Amino acid sequence: MLESHYYKDMVEAGCDEAGRGCLAGSVYAAAVILPPGYQNAELNDSKKLTDKKRKALREQIERDAVAWAVGVVTPEEIDKINILNASFLAMHRALDQLKVRPEAVIVDGNRFKPYKDLPYTTIVKGDGKYLSIAAASILAKTYRDDYMDALAEEYPQYDWKANKGYPTKKHRAAIREFGVTPYHRMSYNLLGTGELSIDFKD
């Protein structure tokens, strides 16, 4: 069972992001405040759960949470400010939207940009240690997956329904064959060969 809270007797928001390593699409982050003493044995790192389980847990998290929100940073913004800063910005946007103001923040990973004047703690593999971070990882992942599934309808050739924008062989082969879309992150090594961009034929 994951820990319910890191900070004792404080309103604490857990944060996590999804899509940092993707070649295409926005980066998503979620912030979740769970009730004091909350318990849920099924909550865990979203990467360890099936898609069906994540979707079911998303509904439960949204019902049970004191507050929750999702923040999004676009590929254009990622290219301007880099993916690390974009991840921080997505988390800040999620925190901005919370209907209850947290008194502290816990974040998956080892880096975070301070949010307002709130105390914060970064926790490596936090999505497998704290319930609110696990909940945030599930919301960020499922909302981003839904977004990539919608983009896949528009651009089916990139196999985004399966790869969600991550750098698979099929995704990179499609970039070579069809070029890039407005959703690709141009600052990334899209072809995996040291080449960032592609020459389009007239």
Language-model segments: residues:
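RNase H-like, Mg2+-dependent phosphodiesterase core
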Residues: 1-202
